[in-house]
Swiss-Prot record:
Record's note on what induces expression: Constitutively expressed, increases in stationary phase (at protein level).
Lineage of origin: Bacteria, Pseudomonadati, Pseudomonadota, Gammaproteobacteria, Enterobacterales
Official protein name in the record: Energy-dependent translational throttle protein EttA
Location within or outside the cell: Cytoplasm
Any single Pfam family the record assigns to this protein: ABC_tran
Predominant place of localization: cytoplasm
Length: 555
């Protein structure tokens, strides 16, 4: 094989109005290299992949794969035939084997004809069996079922037209992996995957013999799969050899040289780096330490010391001893039982990470806690001092014609944030919208910027109990880190639905895990501790993803 599978020479990309989002990038990609692409939202990461996939040809410089290199590309919004079933879409990836198996059955049937040309049939049979043998075709159904379980695909006979965006992405990813290209270009492959499916994908790509270039904000994924980090910074492509943790070390050293203008970002990075360096045991004690520090977090002096953090979660009223108690909760939709006899209580200072497959009922729990829906039976009791602040995962309700400042402030110079008042521009600035950025139209924002704006809008009520539904979606790593630090310093409680394992390990004091047939488990500890507990009590197979099973309600 050639020394490089893909080369880029002085590649640049200009977007209106004459802005260079990529400039003068020269890179060569080794066979089998695993590269994670990092950069702020809007840095040009998706553009880079579209160029490499040959979709965006309006560029400066040259970008080309070596001859005969087969490239597979997963965009953020993949296109599938809406008339196909899930099974038909997946079988497109292995059509050569599917067709060979069908034709082989026909050849066997033709042997029954006494006038058949047996020599010709035998030759065709041999050719077909070679194809099937080369791809382990006789085990094709087993391969497809295993992949469908791992990525929690919908039922085989489900129509693509009826699937959600997340379900379509999982089908497209499954199909792409089964195609086995020489080079995989993956734009946010972990989006819409739960933690167990991400872990499976991680192992798959680690063992994949081809080259992988992946845009992802999943830092365990970057730690466990990537051998290189490509950082896009102000149009330039900066390669770093090593995984995410080693990149963090190098980045810290680099920012030390740019200390004055990078002071806030460096402070945030150093907090995460301190956590990385502690190792597993030190990390696991963090959750307990947070609970023990709850009184300090509540103090006015402590809150004032943290007013310079990059992202700000306004504190609510002081929490009393009772926060949330759930007793014998049961909830169903139609004939599907989502929650069966769930009981738990949350102590002061807890941050509960909620995990489980999509569609298992995680958001439904939030709607019951906030009173938007009622349980079938059981009780949810909030403490008298609890004030809820909810952030849902839907960010389409914002007015695209308004500026960032107008969307949050409603045009007011002074805003009420919880029980206090503050200048609206100062509040918006606490979500990293500085200066001219506050004048940007909402419709011009990247996914990550919309995420920050969404947080700024919904957190201004100043709650002491946060319900955060997929707050990490579309956030770049800088903002993820800032959100983690803000949650760790928040003087209240939070329940957070997330599939980001690094995020859950840094912030969670407890885990609520949605499993099969309405079972939900409550565990004290972070995500890694919970995985170790499951492996210890249920065996390694318990960590393998499977398509979710709903318990049927007896009629």
């Amino acid at each position: 094989m050639a020394q490089f599978v893909y080369t880029m020479h002085r590649v640049g990309k200009v977007v209106p109005p004459k802005r260079h989002i990529l400039k003068n990038i020269s890179l060569s990609f080794f066979p089998g290299a695993k590269i994670g692409v990092l950069g702020l939202n809007g840095a040009g990461k998706s553009t880079l992949l579209r160029i490499m996939a040959g979709i965006d040809k309006d560029i400066e410089g040259e970008a080309r794969p070596q001859p005969d290199i087969k490239i597979g590309y997963l965009p953020q919004e993949p296109q599938l035939n809406p008339e196909h079933t899930v099974r038909e879409s997946i079988e497109e990836a292995v059509s050569e084997v599917v067709n060979a198996l069908k034709r082989l059955d026909e050849v066997y049937a033709l042997y029954a004809d006494p006038d058949a040309d047996f020599d010709k049939l035998a030759a065709e049979q041999g050719r077909l069996e070679e194809i099937i043998q080369a791809h382990d075709g006789h085990n094709l159904n087993v391969q497809l079922e295993r992949a469908a379980d791992a990525l929690r695909l919908p039922d085989w006979d489900a129509k693509i037209a009826n699937l959600s965006g997340g379900e379509r992405r999982r089908v497209a990813l499954c199909r792409l992996l089964l195609e086995k290209p020489d080079m995989l270009l993956l734009d946010e492959p972990t989006n819409h995957l739960d933690a167990e499916s991400v872990a499976w994908l991680e192992r798959f790509l680690h063992d994949f013999e081809g080259t992988v270039v992946a845009i992802t904000h999943d830092r365990y994924f970057l730690d466990n799969v990537a051998g290189w980090i490509l950082e896009l910074d102000r149009g330039e492509g900066i390669p770093w050899e090593g995984n995410y943790s080693s990149w963090l070390e190098q980045k810290d050293q680099r920012l030390a040289q740019e200390a004055s203008q990078e002071a806030a970002r460096r402070k945030s990075i150093e907090k995460e780096l301190e956590w990385v360096r502690q190792g597993t045991k030190g990390r696991q004690s963090k959750g307990k330490a947070r609970l023990a520090r709850f009184e300090e977090l509540n103090s006015t002096e402590y809150q004032k010391r943290n007013e310079t953090n990059e992202l700000f979660i306004p504190p609510g009223p002081r929490l009393g001893d009772k926060v949330l108690e759930v007793s014998n909760l049961r909830k169903s939709y139609g004939d599907r039982l989502l929650i069966d006899d769930l009981s738990f209580s949350i102590p002061k200072g807890a941050i509960v990470g909620i995990i489980g497959p999509n569609g298992a009922g995680k958001s439904t729990l939030f709607r019951m806690i906030s009173g938007q829906e009622q349980p079938d039976s059981g009780t949810i009791t909030l403490g008298e001092t609890v004030k809820l602040a909810s952030v849902d995962q839907f960010r389409d309700s914002m007015d695209n014609s308004k500026t960032v400042w107008e969307e949050v402030s409603g045009g007011l110079d002074i805003m009420k944030i919880g029980n206090t008042e503050m200048p609206s521009r100062a509040y918006v600035g606490r979500f990293n919208f500085k200066g001219v950025d506050q004048g940007k139209r909402v419709g011009e924002l990247s996914g990550g910027e919309r995420g920050r704006l969404h947080l700024a809008k919904l957190l201004q009520v100043g709650g002491n109990m946060l319900l955060l539904d997929e707050p990490t979606n579309d956030l770049d790593i800088e903002t993820l880190r800032a959100l983690e630090n803000a949650l760790l310093e928040f003087p209240g409680c939070a329940m957070v639905i997330s599939h980001d394992r690094w995020f859950l390990d840094r912030i969670a004091t407890h885990i609520l895990d949605y499993q099969d047939e309405g079972k939900v488990e409550f565990f004290e500890g972070n995500f890694t501790e919970y995985e170790e507990y499951k492996k210890r009590t249920l065996g390694a197979d318990a960590l393998e993803p499977k398509r979710i099973k709903y318990k049927r309600i007896a009629k």
